[in-house]
């Protein structure tokens, strides 16, 4: 029991440091930075959260994927389409958030099924995710006024928040994602991901459904 508690403390201590330091940086960032820097960093914080997922897949599972930007775009465009063509309200915003996540998950599940459930190599997954980005771009460009084409979706109503508030939201999101990623890679599930990267065939011999784990 004492060894288990000590292990939990060793795992949670870095998470507490990440949250504390991150909260301080995010909290005081808009106070010491000019509005232009806050605007740029808000976008950068969101992109950093997406980059963390690339690190998990490539760094810990050995799968080079180009699809994170596509999944990000699918979720964002799902919400944007709802706001543009249906309208905006707090309840619609919640529905758009849920539908955006579900749409991205559905496409990711389809890509995972194509890439991992047919005995294909990780290179095949890289090619599929690269093609997905190209397909998403062409769909948006070909959608005309419905998708905004090359100009994107603009002019729809949203929450009337200051750039400082958006900075805090983006920073808080990155802190949560970073802490979650740390807990994942230092858990039993994280060790399984590393084992799949090192020797996937042996993991299958041990009864692990590696295709399901990689898709998840």
Regions found by a protein language model. Give the residues of each.
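Transmembrane alpha-helices and adjacent helix-loop boundaries
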Residues: 1-216
């Amino acid at each position: 029991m004492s060894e288990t508690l000590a292990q939990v403390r060793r795992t949670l201590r870095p998470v507490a440091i990440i949250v504390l330091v991150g909260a301080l940086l995010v909290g005081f960032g808009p106070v010491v930075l000019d509005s232009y820097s806050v605007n740029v960093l808000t976008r950068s914080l969101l992109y950093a959260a997406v980059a963390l997922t690339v690190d998990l897949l490539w760094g810990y599972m050995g799968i080079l994927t180009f699809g994170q930007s596509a999944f990000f775009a699918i979720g964002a465009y799902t919400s944007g389409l709802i706001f543009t063509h249906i309208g905006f309200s707090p309840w619609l915003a919640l529905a758009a958030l849920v539908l955006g996540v579900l749409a991205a998950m559905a496409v990711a599940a389809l890509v995972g099924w194509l890439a991992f459930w047919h005995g294909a190599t990780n290179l095949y997954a890289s090619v599929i995710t690269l093609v997905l980005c190209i397909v998403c771009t062409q769909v948006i460009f070909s959608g005309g006024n419905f998708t905004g084409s090359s100009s994107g979706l603009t002019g729809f109503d949203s929450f009337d928040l200051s750039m400082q508030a958006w900075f805090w939201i983006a920073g808080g999101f990155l802190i949560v994602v970073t802490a979650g990623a740390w807990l994942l890679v230092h858990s039993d599930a994280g060790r399984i991901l590393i084992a799949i990267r090192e020797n996937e065939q042996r993991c299958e011999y041990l009864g692990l459904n590696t295709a399901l784990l990689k898709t998840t």
